Amino acid sequence: MTDQIYYETMYILRPDIAEEEVKNHIDKYNKLLEEFGATILDSQMRGKRRLAYQIAKHREGIYVQLSHQGDGQHIFKIEKAMRLSEDVIRYLTVKQEGPLPTPRSSNKSSNQAEKKENENIDSANKSEPKADETDNKKKITLESSTPELEEQVKS
């Protein structure tokens, strides 16, 4: 058996497709990957976004992200299916170093705890200066003479 490699495929669907059709496309490509021997790790619809440049006369597209694992033989087959589909205007598959990190939503509570801890540290650092620090410094006014200013600059 060959090694299982992690892949991420991002594809863009036409923006004028109905939401039900988008779900059908996602299910279709997920099933195709499973038929070709890949394991689907994650499938996310990223929503409709503005494209950086016009593709097939479209300024927007519906982004879908697939994370999958397989031996690599399934990549050609899934990309061929996307190439033949009129609803897919662009696709890209990249090889990943390893499995994707856990989604941010599951780490939400730990992230909130980190933010509170950072806020506490920031507030402690921003506290007002101590009384003895302010007493040592002499306030300089516009009426101050030049020798006093020079003395302050030197120290």
Swiss-Prot record:
Biased composition (Polar residues): 103-112
UniProt entry keywords in alphabetical sequence: Ribonucleoprotein, Ribosomal protein, RNA-binding, rRNA-binding
Gene3D superfamilies named among the record's database cross-references: 3.30.70.60
UniProt record, GO biological process: translation
PROSITE patterns: RIBOSOMAL_S6
Pfam family, one: Ribosomal_S6
Region (Disordered): 94-155
GO molecular function, one term: structural constituent of ribosome
Listed Basic and acidic residues bias regions: 113-141
Coiled coil spans: none
GO cellular component, one term: ribonucleoprotein complex
UniProt record similarity statement: Belongs to the bacterial ribosomal protein bS6 family.
PANTHER family in the cross-refs: MITOCHONDRIAL 28S RIBOSOMAL PROTEIN S6, SMALL RIBOSOMAL SUBUNIT PROTEIN BS6M
Function: Binds together with bS18 to 16S ribosomal RNA.
The protein's name in its UniProt record: Small ribosomal subunit protein bS6
